[in-house]
């Protein structure tokens, strides 16, 4: 195993062994300084290269055939090349004075090596990549010597013109990058002359020179390879050259000398264009050598691309290069562009090429291991576009083997396909097939299983989702919600429930929220994950804030599942008794406004009247309201039967808070709209400003909320049933029950008490519902005025009333001057029942009587205070004897001081 070398120029065992190798060869075989020319020293050069290769193999830096074995090896190889360069005999006799202090420890370690030997070792011992880096990043006074030596040695290194093309391309690439990395205009001219010389010497760009190759087929192959390499160099050099940063290895080679300069000119493009023109001139001459026969021959030739034959590859490269050249005014005018046009017109894009393949060929291409990343991605994109692949084991295996190449886009393609599957399986009722509804109350039954695509989910979609970043995960979850895919497929891992429970048990609002883990749980079962999160929200204000913070970070996804949280909480007795349940459920009612965005004004959170992160229209807002009110209705229905008063009380308080909250929302919204209209005057054509239009849209929606709510029949009917069930008599009275009745009646009276003004159809629905209720008396009053004719009617209503209803009844009795008689009848009824609940009921009703009496006495100025007091005492005298003193005390505390009565004197007078 290779140990990474952080600092390439540090001394190491490899350098020590290399030093021994060169000294031994210098002393025992051949003195290196006597090797002046390559010619005649071929055998020595080969032996030295073999020994260096063996040394690199020993250190696992290369393997046979010679390739870089591990990315960690590169720093070792870079250091080795610099080590050789520092010990090479250069033409510049002052070069030793140029070395920096950072590399002096490596100098004079070896006998002086001929420059051509250094190049031979680089080419033959897997140091070609470091050599290219050195030529691109090293000091120009030094690298120009290597360009010259490379030019001289190239044909000697390999006499095969085709095989020298990759080496030539490496030198050309390095030259192009050198102009950008170290932009030295004077030195660039020398470099450009050297490049022109190198191309002229080593590229067969004339008919005469081309015919030095013995066979026509070889000539056709050479032309293809030459074009391929030249075009690649041009693309590499001209594709956004100024946007590419210097490579990390630049620092390695910049340490060699003290005087290396990054740039003496701010703009390398003039010299870069000159460099490109030199290559384009050669390319133009090669184009002229391409006959129709050669072009057709290329069609049968394999290329380095697994996707294209040689002809197709050259056409595609030509199209890419032409596009780059035409983006530059000067280079776009080069004559070769006209020659390239016909090739570019015949080019096939990657997408076109993979689309031509049969699915078996496409799989073979993707799995071949020969495709570039760009080609591989095009192949995978095409595979994902063939929906038949999602049901094929072979295709799924190929997808799974290339997960690293897959992105959010591929996950979205899968979900869109699954959405189509779900839609196709949902047949309308008139076709005689019904769709099974999902049991919303059962965690484990949220999704049904579709075995045909189980492997697509487990092998591809799930691991693909895991590797996406947080934002992409949120987008994928949203698309899945929009496609309604969870209704037809099971996304859960076997241990999902255990992990979900553990996640929320360990969640700490003081620590950073583990959003990635949360989104994975949402992928497996979003509905239940949000429900469990909401269970924490009702326990503590900080968990509530955390819930809404996370919901606002993925608002559109959260909007799909928050209604389910309300469905769950409002039928859960334990959750409704949590300390923050009322406030949290109220937020759930307004979740569309919260998710769209809130703002702070005067230290208060206010609803925004503009399109935020989760805009909504009438349909979305009404649907969210209906779902929540349905949940309230279900809660009332569940808790009224066992008379679960604490749970009923919270739901009824919630309904009251909703009514008050809507009123506040409308008031604030109107004020904000007025301010916006002042800030944004009407346009010249008389239209409202865009911001005002949007604000009016939201103001109208918010103003519609009470009307929609009061027309929600399911809730109305259950409120009526709740009121009916909470009605009491003298045997069943209890304060808590009456408190709940008061809340229920308040909600009814807040918007629906004036039934005589309701529409005929709605009024009839109310009447039909009333006919099914046990206690119809109050409903008859609401429906028909002047139905109270005698004291018996009043008594019947009083002994089942809420506080407000009792107060209203006593006001009517006081006006009729029948209060004393009714209180007497009430007292008789209480005595007859003779239970604690009956006496509690009398106390309750008497307190309400005192409230009504206070109002009566305040407004009736025709009677003196003493007369009022005497009337009150007459009513007190009707109280049951066992609690009369208590009733007297209540009356005295309420009115003795007000009427100027001295209770002690009055009691003494009686005595």
UniProtKB/Swiss-Prot annotation:
Transmembrane segments: none
Example of a GO cellular component annotation carried by this entry: SMN complex
Disruption phenotype: RNAi-mediated knockdown is pupal to adult lethal while simultaneous RNAi-mediated knockdown of all 3 Gem4 paralogs (Glos/Gem4a, Gem4b and Gem4c) is larval lethal; this phenotype does not appear to be due to loss of snRNP biogenesis. Conditional RNAi-mediated knockdown in muscle cells or the central nervous system reduces adult viability and results in age-dependent progressive decline of the neuromuscular system; knockdown in muscle cells becomes fully adult lethal due to reduced motor function when combined with a hypomorphic Gem3 mutation.
Domain of life according to the entry: Eukaryota
Recorded coiled-coil stretches: none
Miscellaneous remark of the record: 'Gaulos' is the Phoenician word for a merchant boat. This name reflects the boat shaped expression pattern seen in stage 7-10 embryos.
Subunit-level organization: Component of the core survival motor neuron (SMN) complex composed of Smn, Gem2, Gem3, rig/Gem5 and one of 3 almost identical Gem4 paralogs encoded by Glos/Gem4a, Gem4b or Gem4c. Interacts with Smn; the interaction is probably indirect.
Physiological role: Component of the survival motor neuron (SMN) complex that catalyzes the assembly of small nuclear ribonucleoproteins (snRNPs), the building blocks of the spliceosome, and thereby plays an important role in the splicing of cellular pre-mRNAs. One of 3 almost identical paralogs (Glos/Gem4a, Gem4b and Gem4c), resulting from a genomic triplication, that have some redundant function. Required for neuromuscular function and organismal viability.
Descriptive protein name: Gem-associated protein 4a
Encoding gene per record: Glos
